[in-house]
């Protein structure tokens, strides 16, 4: 595996309105059912429209890696709708600078890539100002093999 430091890049993350769903899951495999079979139909029922460019990500609230993953799913929508039991709407402000790295492969190995990105931020004196976003770009829905899956890990920072 290449050195993460050679693959880190910076970008801004736009202010958007998001449909969100938070719950505890036992493993990342549950996302394969949660997104298309629970979140998707509820967003459709509420009349959500997802504008281009599409932007969805997950945020984890656990302090340590393990089971009972406290996760929140965010998907950008054109406008705020009325909250439901499953879906809450939030507006997130722009993130002027995020350190990013692309993780390829299974979700179970993302904690190692995240740890390397976090270490890179600390080593280079960046102040982390919010939780990391795990933006699932390529996955089971559009790729043949797990090795082709790509998740962009976005770490909001403040430049010193």
Where in this protein do the model-derived segments appear?
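A solvent-exposed interaction/effector surface
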Residues: 1-160
């Amino acid at each position: 595996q290449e050195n993460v430091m050679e693959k880190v890049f910076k970008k801004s993350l736009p202010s958007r309105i998001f449909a969100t769903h938070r719950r505890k899951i036992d493993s990342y495999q549950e996302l394969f059912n949660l997104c298309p079979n629970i979140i998707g139909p509820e967003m459709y029922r509420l009349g959500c429209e997802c504008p281009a460019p599409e932007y969805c990500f997950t945020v984890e609230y656990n302090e340590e890696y393990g089971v009972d993953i406290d996760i929140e799913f965010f998907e950008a929508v054109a406008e705020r709708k009325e909250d439901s039991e499953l879906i809450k709407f939030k507006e997130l402000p722009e993130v002027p600078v995020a350190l990013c790295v692309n993780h390829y492969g299974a979700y179970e190995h993302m904690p190692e890539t995240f740890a390397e990105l976090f270490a890179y931020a600390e080593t280079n004196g960046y102040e982390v100002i919010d939780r990391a976003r795990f933006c699932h770009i390529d996955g089971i829905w559009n790729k043949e093999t797990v090795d082709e899956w790509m998740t962009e890990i976005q770490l909001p920072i403040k430049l010193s």
